[in-house]
Regions:
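Glycine-rich FAD pyrophosphate-binding loop
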Residues: 4-8, 17-41
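N-terminal Rossmann-fold NAD(P) dinucleotide-binding loop
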Residues: 12-13
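N-terminal FAD cofactor-binding segment of flavoenzymes
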Residues: 37-75
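Conserved N-terminal helical subregion
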Residues: 65-117
Length: 117
């Protein structure tokens, strides 16, 4: 089966890679790659989504940072309040740099013969 994807973004690249592993032929249509570098952007991936992605992208968790606690400080005049998320130290999500994630998925996509640009 042949699938056409529009756009050369993270979602399209992940979808193309996963479908190619299931023996679909993929064509990705996009304009020239944007020269924007998002070296300060990060993504938060939940534990369940990371587990799913690791079925297709080996060792992805090695490139992530585990976040198990978030503290928010609210300063409003005389009131200083701190909100703590996840006092149980359960993994909330994993952070990965956007450009690093794109590099990983583009490398995987470029190795697949059934994905065309």
């Amino acid at each position: 089966m042949k699938v056409c994807l529009i756009g050369n973004n993270l979602t399209s690249l992940i979808l193309a890679y996963i479908l190619s592993k299931k023996n679909f032929n993929i064509e990705i249509y996009s304009l020239k790659s944007s020269k924007h570098v998002f070296n300060t952007r990060t993504l938060g991936i939940t534990a369940s989504n990371l587990k799913y992605l690791e079925k297709y992208l080996d060792n992805l968790s090695r490139n992530t940072n585990c976040i198990d606690e978030i503290k928010v400080l609210i300063q409003n005049g005389k009131i200083n309040e701190e909100i703590l998320f996840n006092q149980n130290s359960i993994n909330l999500f994993n952070m990965i740099k956007y450009d690093q994630f794109i590099k990983i998925i583009k490398k995987k996509v470029s190795q697949k013969k059934n994905i065309l640009f």
